[in-house]
Design a protein with these regions (language model features):
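Generic recognition of long tandem-repeat/solenoid scaffolds
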Residues: 118-122, 230-236, 287, 293-298, ...
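Catalytic and substrate-binding regions of extracellular carbohydrate-active enzymes
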Residues: 72-75, 85-272
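A short beta-strand/turn structural motif
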Residues: 270-292
């Protein structure tokens, strides 16, 4: 919902003013910059009548696409407006902007125990990794990629969760997808890391594809943090339908996001899956398949999903139309008969 950015703007303006009062100009400027970035994000979601798209898609209000049961055009516009007014009241426009952490990056923030997330940023290129998805809201794996100077919704900006009826508290099923591995076994079974939700703090009332008698181990390793680039590796060890270990190595620098997936086990082939926004409710994404890559273009940005290993891989699409918060998605993929697969998401192509 767009009120999240409005709430962030309030927090950042308060901190900017407090740091300025302490004479800490650089910190104050960083929070001022962050407040402006939050408000700029809201500016992407203004309707022709001046109200906001409360969820980040452009479907008509009456469709309620991507809404929660408690979402409504009225109260969430009012909440966002009220929060922006509060931000205005706290704002000190004598504070000059300085770079914020989201501009510079150089960090990997591991929040395993409570939020089961990893956040990482290098030079404004950013990812969110969901270590153990709640299937009502998130798949497991790499669910969000935002690249500097691109359309954030193309990232993708969200994974694909199950459809959930909040009023009846009922899981309506569906397909779970994130950026990451899918594997096929000799018997024809198809499995994805994204499906192994609800595995860190399991709740038996929620879906998980994991059937092992012992919970898997989830480790975040090989964290690297520098101004030039950041990296981390997520390793799952357990019983994943023929696979005993899944590793995703994520490297971020100014050129984009590079991912290497390694599976240990008896698999017939491995695919790298990439959820593509194909329709935001008002505009369909332009999709261009070229040798070893697919280029997406929508509104003010482009992004490229590119196969690195195996070389000469062909990128295909599943030709699905899966509803999720940002609109409808299809899945781009390429495959390998090896247990290692590598790819890149970039704006440089």
């Amino acid at each position: 919902h767009i009120w999240n950015e409005a709430a962030a703007a309030v927090t950042y303006e308060i901190y900017a003013s407090q740091y300025a009062a302490l004479g800490k100009k650089q910190e104050a400027g960083a929070f001022k910059r962050a407040a402006h970035l939050a408000l700029r994000s809201i500016g992407r979601w203004i309707r022709e009548d001046g109200s906001g798209f409360i969820v980040k898609n452009r479907f008509p209000i009456e469709v309620m696409h991507g809404y929660e049961s408690y979402s409504a055009q009225s109260q969430y516009n009012l909440l966002a407006c009220w929060l922006m007014c509060v931000a205005y009241l706290y704002a000190d426009n004598s504070i000059k902007e300085s770079p914020s952490p989201s501009d510079i990056g150089g960090y990997v923030l591991v929040m395993k125990d409570v939020f089961h997330k990893v956040f990482a940023n290098s030079g404004g290129n950013y990812v969110e990794y969901e270590l153990s998805g709640d299937p009502r809201y998130n798949a497991t794996g790499l669910i969000r990629i935002h690249l500097k100077n691109s359309n954030p919704q193309l990232g993708p900006s969200d994974g694909i969760p199950h459809k959930w009826d909040n009023k009846k508290k009922q899981d309506l099923g569906g397909e779970l997808y994130a950026v990451g591995p899918e594997w096929h076994d000799a018997a024809g079974g198809v499995y994805r890391l994204a499906e192994y939700t609800n595995i860190l703090f399991p709740d038996t009332s929620y879906f998980s594809a994991y059937k092992g008698s012992k919970l898997p181990e989830i480790d975040v390793r090989n964290v690297r943090q520098s101004v030039d680039g950041v990296a981390f590796e997520v390793v799952y060890t357990g019983r994943f339908d023929g696979v005993t270990q899944i590793s995703q190595r994520v490297y971020i620098d100014h050129t984009g996001i590079t991912v290497r997936d390694i599976l240990k086990g008896n698999v017939k082939k491995v695919r790298a899956c990439y959820p593509m926004l194909i329709d935001d409710g008002m505009e369909e994404t332009k999709i261009d398949f070229q040798d070893g890559k697919v280029i997406l273009q929508s509104r003010d940005g482009q992004i490229c999903f590119q196969a690195i290993s195996p070389p000469n891989a062909t990128i295909q699409r599943k030709r699905k139309r899966i509803p999720y918060r940002n609109g409808y998605a299809d899945i781009a993929y390429f495959e390998s008969d090896k247990n290692v697969i590598q790819y890149k998401i970039t704006t440089e192509f």
